[in-house]
Amino acid sequence: MIPAEFYKYIYLILITIITLFVVKQRNDLNLCEGIGKNVWFCVFLILFIGFRPHSPIFGDMMNYANWWRFSSWNGWDWNTENKIFDNIYGFMGSVFPDATPFFVLIAAIYFIAILIACRKLFPSNTFIVYLVYLAAFSTLSYATNGIKAGAA
């Protein structure tokens, strides 16, 4: 497993190298590109971020991991502050012994939603725009630290 303190650097180096490669290979910006490589890269990001080690380096993640399985699940609770998030967290905490599947789900929501937005707004340059988004806008910190804010 990759040590938590290296995740940020590996992420930024990976995004930079892929961006340079894609920009160098891309000749015609008006051609509508296929979605295949975008989906594969999105799946890679979901797995890379979702299966990260539980570490204080990732901020809020440790709070969610430490409170895992302490809440009991008695069905959907309409009285919670954040109805969807809190109920999913409680349900998954009662089903899975570890918080990792929850982090994978949150990463999937985060990265798939961004990919869909990039595809809708920029159908001919989806991959480049997706890479620019991933390199900018505090993407890594929202995906790992502000779990609720990142998915929202």
Regions found by a protein language model. Give the residues of each.
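Transmembrane-helix motifs of polytopic, lipid-linked glycan transferases
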Residues: 105-123
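Transmembrane-helix signature of polytopic, membrane-embedded enzymes
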Residues: 33-35, 118-136
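Start-transfer (signal-anchor) and selected internal transmembrane alpha helices
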Residues: 1-45
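Structural signal for the C-terminal ends of transmembrane alpha-helices
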Residues: 17-30, 50-53, 116-122
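Hydrophobic core segments of transmembrane alpha-helices in multi-pass, intramembrane catalytic enzymes
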Residues: 8-16, 66, 106-111, 133, ...
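Extracytoplasmic loop-helix module adjacent to an early transmembrane segment
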Residues: 35-42, 50-74
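Short hydrophobic/aromatic helix or loop-helix immediately within or flanking a transmembrane segment
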Residues: 60-97
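Membrane-embedded helix bundles of polyisoprenyl
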Residues: 127-146, 150-151
